[in-house]
A protein has these predicted regions:
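Alpha-helix N-cap/helix-start motif at helix boundaries, enriched for small hydrophobics
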Residues: 79-81
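Hydrophobic alpha-helical transmembrane segments of membrane proteins
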Residues: 1-65, 83-214
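Short helix-to-coil transition segments within interhelical loops
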Residues: 71-77
Length: 214
């Protein structure tokens, strides 16, 4: 299991390095230029971008010799799937750290650029939940479909994740009165819903992969 996870991390590393360089430059710009829109963009791009990096390389699961060789190793198919899900979580946390450092430096030099400090929580919740929903949708599609269509699957996953987040936010805004308590409840609801979807997706993907023949 550790070997599978290590391989997934290394497989993502080349894309993540390029994206990290972009995020560092973007972060410097965000610290120098005190603009709320820039900060929002950095949060969303940073957290979601690293998750996309893990999904892009998943195509190698079936198109390389390593992908087929893994099936001969003394590991279960559930372990193979679990390593993919854990890999996304790890890189999601990396993206969250990048964003946290940049926002911290921006607040240090310019103060909070949002109308309320609690708005930062909302941005984090939106980005994290979109990343989790994206993975929850992508992996079952990927393992049920064909590796050659992985690009189509992750585009579908991103669009669906955005739609789900917008739907949840719209419903909560209609049910809750404006206020800090409502903002916190909304952020927590997004995280809980996305985590639940991620967990259910894992079980579904294991079921799909265990029945698939190669």
């Amino acid at each position: 299991m550790k070997g599978l996870l290590r391989n997934n991390i290394y497989g993502t590393l080349s894309n993540a390095k390029v994206f990290s360089e972009f995020m560092i430059l973007f972060g410097i710009f965000g610290v120098v230029v005190p603009d709320q829109t820039v900060q929002i963009g950095y949060v969303m791009i940073g957290i979601i971008g690293f998750s996309v990096s893990t999904i892009i390389v998943t195509k190698n699961e079936f198109t390389t010799k390593w992908g087929k060789y893994k099936l001969t190793l003394p590991v279960t198919r559930s372990d193979i799937v679990k390593s993919q899900y854990l890999n996304q979580v790890i890189w999601l946390l990396v993206g969250t750290c990048f964003v946290g450092i940049e926002l911290g430096l921006s607040c240090l030099f310019h103060g909070c650029l949002f109308d309320q400090p609690i708005d930062i929580l909302t941005m984090f919740a939106l980005a994290i939940s979109m990343s989790l929903f994206m993975g929850a949708i992508f992996f079952p599609l990927f393992y049920a479909g064909e590796a050659e269509k992985s690009e189509v699957f992750w585009i579908i996953a991103i669009l669906c994740a955005f739609g789900i987040d917008c739907t949840i936010v719209t419903i909560l805004n209609g049910l809750l009165e404006p206020g800090i308590a409502s903002i916190v409840f909304g952020a927590v609801s997004l995280i809980i819903c996305s985590l639940a979807a991620f967990g259910i997706s894992y079980l579904l993907t294991v079921s799909i992969y265990s029945k698939k023949e190669y």
